[in-house]
Amino acid sequence: MFSLPRVFTLSLVFVACASQLNIRQSTNTNAAINSILDTLDESIHHISPTILTLMANQTLSASTLGPQMTTLENAFTQADNDLAATAVSAGSTTVAPTNDDISITYSDIMQLVSTTLSGIIPSGDVPGFPTMVQTFDPIMAKTTLQLNITSPASLVLVHKMMADARQFFAAEGFTQTLSALGF
């Protein structure tokens, strides 16, 4: 039925075809992902106090908030681009930074953004804030989804940690971001 040369030839063909397949998650790129998120987290920790100071000093307006929102948008866009350029991570639950470390950092970022922006609508000082949200929301949602691609299942813990803070995103109109987070 099958001669030895045919079996050998078929085996070589199968090996050649199989060697072309790339393993989807071959390396742990958590360190690169964590570095990207640390940069984003640092940016958010600079932008948030500025926005909160504008509110506290009663100098919040479209002209003072606009540049801060642009800075937020740029920070998330850069993180999205950097995450997209990073190989999908095999991840790790034991080697630092772990999958949970990444999720905790991103959750911190999201909680800080949601709580920082939560006082803008009630203040009434920026009537154009919903328009700013319409611009920023898809950017933040895209970064969130890209994180979940580059670090698979990373949003599971973020979703749980955002259980309370999601109310602020809902009140501010961040529907795409909430959807990306699984709400």
Labelled PLM ranges:
Residues 1-26:
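Fungal secretory targeting signals
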Residues 20-183:
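A taxonomically broad motif for mature regions of secreted/extracellular
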